[in-house]
UniProtKB/Swiss-Prot annotation:
Protein name (Swiss-Prot/TrEMBL): Acetyl-CoA acetyltransferase
Residues at the active site: 85 (acyl-thioester intermediate), 336 (proton acceptor)
Family per record: Belongs to the thiolase-like superfamily. Thiolase family.
Pathway membership, UniProt: Metabolic intermediate biosynthesis; (R)-mevalonate biosynthesis; (R)-mevalonate from acetyl-CoA: step 1/3
Any single GO BP term: isoprenoid biosynthetic process
């Protein structure tokens, strides 16, 4: 298998982008990635697009061909990948496998979602849950994650203040991100006093409905040198996917994500590193509780310890001795445009590891040269993890 690298990244702003169309978002992100990589459309061999539900959100299926057309890339192969909120990272995984196998040298991989063009976004999002045993009985993702939070509080003594500090830190980080949906700070009191959604979750514990797109250029490592300087090449050391039950009630435990633990252990082994070697992480904090759980599944701390670590702000950008978590602001504050999220996460790590000027106001200290992303579909039915490094 060949070594695989990222040589360019681009994204749109995330938010309620009423004036933008689905197709214009992904084309903007793709053009930015192509320009950043210093390549031309004719250099691209294939394209993958992560998208959860364009059919429900904008009434458009067959989007892979549509996007290739509007990007001026026909007749290259173009494939859509769907795995709920993990669609973007699974699209990237397919691109990585494609390049590693020798099938292609340069692949454009993007993610996009336009969520504000539908009246009932909640119903569309709920299509990623078990329709017979969850959605049919009125369960929504806020209610499912609320059950996870309640049980976690019961088992480990997590306080609402500890949980809420997650949101405070995410908004602090997002205030330094010009692409973030919520680029402003919030106080602990504001989080605690925000509107109840599903006990114990408040509004400011939840990620928003978002429009947005992101794109990466994935390239064979030797060929990458033809396009960019060596400092702009970041290597993909691991790309791992794992699955679990879609329905939350079918799990052995609702305070852990087994697929995340399995995938992270395999990814660390593939990259030949340990959790302590990670400088920076982007985790799937669709709800604050998931951020805490994923810290534990990634091996950053023991079970039940994440709340205190977060409350002590050890995950902050400027804290020394613990991986910085979600310098972008995470899903919570940077935004969660479903199919684009997995790509955006990897794009942030790419920028961080090469210390790009785009992240100068939120730059993490890079000591070991490793970053990790974890992207989750549903309540953990699909998990995809990528480890990136500035070392080949």
């Amino acid at each position: 298998m060949r070594d695989v690298a990222i040589i360019g990244y681009g994204q749109t702003k995330f938010g309620e982008l009423w004036e933008r169309s689905f197709r214009s978002l992904i084309v903007e992100a793709g053009v930015k990635a192509v320009e950043a990589a210093g390549i031309d459309g004719k250099d691209i061999d294939e394209m993958y697009v992560g998208n959860m539900s364009a059919g429900l959100f904008v009434g458009q299926e067959h989007i892979a061909s549509l996007i290739a057309e509007h990007a001026g890339l026909n007749p290259i192969p173009s494939t859509r990948v769907e795995a709920a909120c993990a669609s973007g990272s699974l699209a990237l995984r397919q691109a990585v496998l494609n390049v590693a196998s020798g099938a292609s040298d340069v692949v454009l991989v993007g993610g996009v979602e336009k969520m504000t063009d539908v009246v009932d976004a909640t119903s569309a999002i709920s299509s990623a849950s078990d329709q017979e045993w969850e959605a049919l009985f009125g369960a929504t993702f806020p209610s499912l994650y609320a059950m996870m939070a309640q049980r976690y509080m019961y088992e480990y003594g997590l306080t609402l203040e500890e949980l809420s500090m997650w949101s405070v830190i995410m908004h602090e980080n997002a205030s330094k991100n010009r692409y973030a949906q919520f680029p402003f700070k919030v106080t602990l009191e504001q989080v605690l006093n925000s509107s109840p959604v599903a006990e114990p979750l408040r509004l400011l514990h939840c990620s928003p409905v978002s429009d947005g797109a992101a794109a990466l250029i994935v390239c064979e490592a030797e060929k990458a040198k033809e396009f960019v300087n060596k400092d702009d090449i970041i290597y993909i050391k691991a790309s791992v996917q794992a699955s679990d039950t879609i329905a939350l009630h079918s799990r052995e435990s609702i305070t852990s994500l087994k697929a995340a633990k399995v995938a992270s252990e395999k990814a660390y082994k593939m990259a030949n590193i340990e959790p302590k070697d990670v400088d920076v992480a982007e985790v799937h904090d669709c709800f604050a509780i998931n951020g805490l759980i994923l810290m534990e599944e990634l091996g950053f701390c023991k079970k039940g310890e994440a709340g205190k670590i977060v409350y002590d702000k050890k995950i902050a950008i400027d804290y020394d001795g613990f991986p910085a978590v979600n310098p972008s602001g995470g899903l919570k504050a940077a935004g969660h445009a479903l199919g684009a999220t997995g790509i955006r996460q990897v794009g942030e790590i790419y920028w961080q590891l090469k210390q790009d000027k785009e992240v100068k106001d939120r730059q993490v200290e890079i000591k070991n040269g490793y970053g990790i992303t974890v992207n989750v579909g549903g309540t953990g039915g699909t998990v995809c993890i990528h480890i990136l490094s500035d070392k080949r």
